[in-house]
From Swiss-Prot:
It comes from the Eukaryota. It comes from Onchocerca volvulus. Transmembrane segments: none annotated. Its EC number is 2.5.1.18. Homodimer. Residues 115-235 form the GST C-terminal domain. This is Glutathione S-transferase 1. PANTHER family: GLUTATHIONE S-TRANSFERASE. The gene is GST1. It catalyses: RX + glutathione = an S-substituted glutathione + a halide anion + H(+). Belongs to the GST superfamily. CDD domains: GST_C_Sigma_like, GST_N_Sigma_like. Keywords: Transferase. SUPFAM superfamilies: GST C-terminal domain-like (SSF47616), Thioredoxin-like (SSF52833). GO terms for molecular function: glutathione transferase activity.
Length: 235
């Protein structure tokens, strides 16, 4: 849960200070992630913060997983860069927007491919998955099982099945077992997270490439341990 020290610090920072602090920002390509102090702030759920948590887990970089309550959010909201979470505090510098955070950490942890073309393709995958994520929000937050099932049925044919078919094809055409390039990237973690979100609703045995992919990513050091210990939440 959020600490009073964190709230006071957030309240005392203006918008410019929250986004940049020239004294502590490091040159690109010369970063030592373990020397930074990271605090990730989000609700007690996977949602838009889970790919970020997977990045930390895979890179074996420590951070504070600051899970706030709705009451705490009322106080914190006007003090965030864009009025929503997740947000990441990096040694006093605050960054908003989940994909911007993924881009920052992916670059620091070596998970954005090996060249600018691969980086662009990785971000294309991230943005494509975000389109599906947006459509799934009502379903992920619905607690009534009957309504939840109906919501998923409505989305299945139009959005979920095309997603599964598309990424099954991508992996079948891949010679590396990865979505982009020849090593694990933010794209892999983004697709993995979406498949884990859909786990109870889809039959991955009908998609052998995706099933193998989920097993491979899920067994990676750091990822395996995080999946086992992460809090059980409804979204």
């Amino acid at each position: 849960f959020i600490t009073m020290n964190f709230v006071v610090e957030a309240a005392s920072s203006n918008a410019n200070q929250a986004i940049t602090s020239e004294n502590s920002i490091k040159p690109k390509g010369k970063l030592q992630p373990q020397m930074e102090k990271y605090t990730l702030t989000y609700f007690n759920g996977r949602g838009r913060a889970e790919v970020i948590r997977l990045l930390f887990a895979l890179a074996n970089v420590s951070y504070e997983d600051n899970r706030i309550t709705r009451d705490e959010w009322k106080y914190l909201k006007p003090r965030t860069p864009f009025g929503h979470v997740p947000m990441l505090n990096v040694s006093g510098n605050v960054l908003g927007e989940s994909h911007a955070i993924e881009l920052l950490l992916g670059g620091r942890f070596g998970l954005l491919g090996t060249n600018d073309w691969e980086e662009a393709k990785i971000m294309a995958v991230v943005l494509n998955i975000d389109e599906l994520f947006q459509k799934l929000i009502p379903w992920t937050h619905e607690k009534n099982t009957t309504k939840k099932a109906e919501l998923f049925r409505n989305l299945s044919e139009s959005d979920v099945m095309p997603f599964l078919g598309r990424y099954e094809k991508f992996l079948k055409e891949s010679t590396t077992g990865h979505i982009v390039g020849n090593k694990v990237s933010v794209a892999d973690l983004t697709v993995f997270n979406m498949l884990m979100t859909l786990d109870d609703e889809v039959k991955l045995e009908e998609y052998p490439q995706l099933a193998s992919f989920v097993n491979k990513i899920g067994q990676m050091p750091g990822i395996k341990e995080w999946i086992k210990k992460r809090p059980k939440t409804y979204f």
